[in-house]
Amino acid sequence: MIKAGQIYKEKELPYWRKHESNIFVISSIDYTACIIYKDGTVDRDIGTKWIKEDCKLIKEYPTWQEAVNSKEFRDE
């Protein structure tokens, strides 16, 4: 189950985002997800199907705030 506080890594970056990080944190989840990338970029309304199929769960924290301050997120 996808939930806030999880850190994911995209398996493959889309061609339009080759310069950005492929590590992100789930900050909220409802019908869609809101995610935060290492550079601070926030994407809203992300489909959970994409996360399930094209991303790998790295680590899980109780809150998204703990996740963005974690070693796994900062040092990856």
PLM features per residue range, with description:
Residues 40-76:
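Intrinsically disordered, low-complexity, charged/polar segments
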Residues 1-14:
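Short coil-to-beta transition motif at edge beta-strands of beta-rich domains
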Residues 13-49:
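Basic/aromatic-rich interaction segments and small domains that mediate binding to polyanionic partners
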